[in-house]
């Protein structure tokens, strides 16, 4: 507890967790945990042909497959522990028998054991009994050695390969899902959004061109119109190619990639079942004795091993998890994009004088990529063939009971086949895009590309332009009328009355966001014309923020003589001013030309200051004071964090960072966000009130009276909360006892997310200084390079464990921050606290591995703590 240090010595690590599991789902468990089937399959299905097919392609099925493998791994660990104990018992028993014979030999001498004056049946019987006991001890010792060198060693290999299989399967499934989502959803949606924007720009440019009266203005408008069409056509082609690629990726994903992945997993799982059967058979053979009573037990064990059939091992699992999951529809061209566009056909490339060059360049580029893709496919096919030949040759030379040594090679073959499927998919997409481009150019032949559009000649009269526009309008009207006949009619709710909404005060307007940071405004405004009203954090003024031409613009609403204005005449209230700008569609200012189109509404977390009744001050944070309080609506007890009004805007934005993280969290071991008050100063973050206070004070005051099992349970709570954050790619960066809260029932909750960050790849690179970093809780890679990740949080969790079992002592108490960093770099770690269980301290040491990749995940830490708690009765 004094925070002294020691250098870790090399030691043999042994597994600290072993839990019973089962591979085969019993009928009773099916009745308790029956899940919906993926499809209506016949009940008398041929189980031998069943695999991890379409029933398990959905995320639920993937989760169940991972859970199945985890269950099997737990069972294998249990078997390994069992066999190890059996070998140890046999060695000890053989040693005891040998000791008995040695003692007898010392007392009587080997000659006296048999030599008698006459032939004595008793002496001969005694010699046989004693000598056969020694023979039995040698046999048992040999059996123990064979058990350790045979089944036990092979079981370790099987566990290692099964862990690797689970890891590879999970990674490949995630990779396939991410690639599928990127190709069929994200990229297509991004192009669709750009498509709509360019269609609007093109329509606007066309209108200006048609309305231009002077020659100079008309020529200028014409150039702008042509440029907009050029961009639109180029993007149209890009979108067509993306849709083609997405459709092919969809087909390949559900017809090739997923079936190959699941067939590979199913095959390897079956192979591992067969390997385990051989291992158990060898175990049964080695441990078999000849006594009748033992033989009866052995026959039962042998029968149980014989019942293992790899072909039907997973039949009950597949039957139990047949989810109702349909393959999503293939990606097709969104014809709604063409409602306002001209001369464009769905799914057809646009080849004209504006796009001929880009189409030719695209064809050249894709042909180069296709050539490289073909080489990669050919190389991978050769590698798959070589692995198959090697595997067949080794199978022929394989001795009975040695299949386990081929598991790694089988898994390598399956991985290569899966990689081949990915390369084939990429080649198919490139080939389809290349064919589409080549066919389009072949249709053109040696002719000149057609003009991009029939531009009106400058000499045409305005009257003819009006006639053409009216003709187009009439044609669109006819189209809309015809499509309306066949499209379903939807009943729409009546429009919301505008007058009562306008008369509401500013704080009740859905588009008023209060004192939110300027940086957050940029995230909320997504499309041109989006707007909101906020309160300036520095000057106590109201600001109208609008997105225009891809940039957020901010206009201070001027207040004078009880009127609010931006440029023209004022109105009595800001809601009336905003409503006037929306209804009239007049520019905000003549210079900017900005027009409001869509209000951005505040989210569900926004509370008014009047909704919260403040109580007494219960603490102080980095940004301001913390109060107890109640919600006026239902008297819910809450904790209210306030932000000092004098702080600069960048610190106020950091204050709200905690709320942005907590909005996405919903877990019993994470403190719950209730809302945010940003309508005026000071800003509040409203959270659930955790009555027990911070964990550090709890340890120092109540820790000595706390039972060991309860303390482990509280650490289990912390690990569960951090495991949830890890799944959300959230990095806490300040995990310590002082930042955890304890409920009245001694449940621990993770709190204080002021330094937290959320990154898609789970890694955050800090570029700030070291002033506020808690050095003694922070991982070395974060201190040295600013690299924060869930692995660095695991290091901090190890310090939290040490704090808990030292009952609130200060880590590295006798060292400064700099001395602590130097000691850690030299391999020095904290000594185990008094009364700390050995398996808990081993877990701490694993958390303090210098290499982040060697530290356990929070999921593993959580499971280890559960196992440790179960062992401490």
From Swiss-Prot:
Any one GO MF annotation of this record: ATP binding
PROSITE patterns membership: F_BAR, PROTEIN_KINASE_ATP, PROTEIN_KINASE_DOM, PROTEIN_KINASE_TYR, SH2
InterPro entries cross-referenced by the UniProt entry: AH/BAR_dom_sf (IPR027267), F_BAR (IPR031160), FCH_dom (IPR001060), Fes/Fps/Fer_SH2 (IPR035849), Kinase-like_dom_sf (IPR011009), Non-receptor_tyrosine_kinases (IPR050198), Prot_kinase_dom (IPR000719), Protein_kinase_ATP_BS (IPR017441)
Domain of life: Viruses
EC numbers, comma separated: 2.7.10.2
Domain F-BAR: 50-313
This protein's record includes keyword Nucleotide-binding: yes
Bias kind Basic and acidic residues: ranges: 456-469
Pfam families with a match to the protein in the record: FCH, PK_Tyr_Ser-Thr, SH2
Residues the record lists as binding ATP: 618-626, 641
Region (Disordered): 1-46, 445-471
UniProt xrefs under PANTHER family: TYROSINE-PROTEIN KINASE
Family according to the record: Belongs to the protein kinase superfamily. Tyr protein kinase family. Fes/fps subfamily.
Protein name per UniProt: Tyrosine-protein kinase transforming protein Fps
Upper lineage: Viruses, Riboviria, Pararnavirae, Artverviricota, Revtraviricetes
């Amino acid at each position: 507890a004094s925070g002294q240090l020691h250098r870790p010595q090399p030691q043999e690590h042994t597994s600290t967790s072993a839990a019973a599991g089962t591979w085969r789902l019993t009928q009773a468990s099916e009745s308790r945990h029956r899940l919906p089937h993926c499809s209506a399959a016949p009940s008398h299905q041929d189980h031998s042909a069943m695999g991890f097919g379409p029933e398990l392609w959905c995320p639920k099925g993937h989760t169940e497959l991972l859970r199945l493998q985890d269950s099997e791994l737990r069972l294998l660990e249990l078997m390994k522990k069992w066999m190890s104990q059996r070998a140890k018992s046999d060695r000890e028993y053989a040693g005891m028998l040998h000791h008995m014979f040695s003692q007898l030999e010392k007392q009587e001498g080997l000659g006296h054991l048999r030599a008698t004056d006459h032939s004595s049946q008793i002496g001969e019987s005694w010699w046989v009994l004693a000598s056969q006991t020694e023979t039995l001890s040698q046999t048992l010792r040999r059996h123990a050695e064979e058990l350790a060198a045979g089944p036990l060693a092979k079981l370790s290999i099987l566990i290692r390969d099964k862990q690797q299989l689970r890891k590879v399967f999970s990674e490949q499934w995630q990779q396939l899902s991410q690639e599928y989502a990127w190709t069929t959803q994200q990229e297509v949606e991004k192009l669709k959004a750009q498509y709509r924007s360019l269609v609007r720009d093109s329509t606007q440019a066309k209108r200006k061109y048609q309305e231009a009266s002077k020659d100079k203005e008309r020529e200028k408008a014409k150039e702008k119109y042509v440029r907009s069409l050029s961009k639109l056509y180029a993007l149209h082609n890009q979108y067509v190619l993306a849709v083609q690629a997405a459709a092919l990726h969809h087909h390949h994903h559900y017809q090739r990639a997923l079936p190959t992945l699941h067939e590979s997993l199913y095959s390897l799982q079956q192979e591992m079942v067969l390997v385990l059967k051989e291992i158990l058979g060898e175990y049964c053979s080695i441990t078999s004795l000849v006594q009748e009573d033992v033989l009866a037990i052995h026959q039962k064990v042998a029968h149980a091993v014989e019942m293992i059939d790899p072909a039907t091992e997973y039949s009950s699992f597949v039957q139990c998890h047949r989810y109702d999951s349909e393959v999503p529809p293939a990606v097709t061209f969104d014809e709604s994009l063409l409602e306002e566009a001209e001369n464009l056909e769905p799914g057809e490339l646009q080849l004209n004088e504006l796009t001929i060059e880009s189409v030719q360049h695209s064809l050249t580029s894709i042909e180069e990529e296709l050539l490289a893709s073909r080489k990669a496919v050919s190389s991978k096919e050769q590698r798959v063939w070589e692995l198959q030949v090697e595997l067949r040759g080794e199978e022929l030379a394989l001795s009975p009971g040695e299949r386990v040594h081929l598991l790694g090679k089988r898994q390598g073959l399956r991985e290569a086949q899966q990689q081949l499927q990915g390369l084939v998919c990429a080649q198919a997409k490139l080939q389809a895009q290349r064919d589409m481009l080549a066919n389009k150019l072949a249709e053109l032949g040696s002719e000149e590309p057609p003009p991009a559009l029939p531009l009106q000649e400058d000499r045409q009269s305005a009257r003819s332009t009006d006639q053409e526009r009216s003709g187009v309008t009439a044609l669109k009207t006819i189209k809309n009328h015809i499509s309306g006949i066949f499209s379903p009619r939807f009943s729409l709710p009546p429009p919301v009355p505008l007058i009562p909404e306008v008369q509401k005060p500013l704080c009740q307007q859905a588009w008023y966001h209060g004192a939110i940071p300027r940086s957050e405004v940029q995230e909320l405004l997504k499309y041109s014309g989006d707007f909101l009203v906020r309160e300036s954090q520095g000057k106590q003024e109201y600001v109208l923020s609008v997105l225009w031409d891809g940039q957020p613009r901010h206009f201070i609403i001027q207040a004078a003589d009880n009127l609010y204005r931006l440029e023209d005449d004022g109105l009595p209230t800001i809601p009336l001013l905003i409503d006037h700008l929306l209804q009239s569609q007049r520019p905000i200012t003549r210079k900017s030309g900005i027009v409001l189109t869509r209000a951005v509404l505040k989210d569900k977390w926004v509370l008014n200051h009047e909704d919260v009744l403040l109580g007494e001050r219960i603490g102080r944070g980095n940004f301001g004071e913390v109060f107890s309080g109640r919600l006026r609506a239902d008297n819910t007890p809450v904790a209210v964090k306030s932000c000092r009004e004098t702080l600069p805007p960048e610190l106020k934005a950091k204050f709200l960072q905690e709320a942005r993280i907590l909005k996405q969290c919903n877990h019993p071991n994470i403190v719950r966000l209730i809302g945010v008050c940003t309508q005026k100063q000071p800003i509040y973050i409203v959270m659930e009130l955790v009555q027990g206070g911070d964990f550090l004070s709890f340890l120092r005051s109540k820790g000595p009276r706390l039972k060991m099992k309860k303390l482990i349970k509280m650490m289990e709570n912390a690990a569960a909360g951090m495991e949830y954050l890890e799944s959300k790619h959230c990095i806490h960066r300040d995990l310590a006892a002082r930042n955890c809260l304890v409920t009245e029932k001694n449940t621990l909750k993770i709190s204080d997310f002021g330094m937290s960050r959320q990154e898609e790849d789970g890694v955050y690179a800090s570029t700030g200084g070291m002033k506020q970093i808690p050095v003694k809780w922070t991982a070395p890679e974060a201190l040295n390079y600013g690299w924060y990740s869930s692995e660095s949080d695991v290091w901090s969790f190890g310090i939290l464990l040490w704090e808990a079992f030292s009952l609130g002592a200060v880590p590295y108490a006798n060292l400064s921050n700099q001395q602590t960093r130097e000691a850690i770099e030299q391999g020095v770690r904290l000594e185990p606290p008094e009364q700390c269980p050995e398996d808990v301290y081993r877990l701490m040491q694993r958390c303090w591995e210098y290499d982040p990749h060697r530290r356990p995940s929070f999921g593993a830490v959580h499971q280890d703590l559960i196992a440790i708690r179960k062992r401490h009765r």
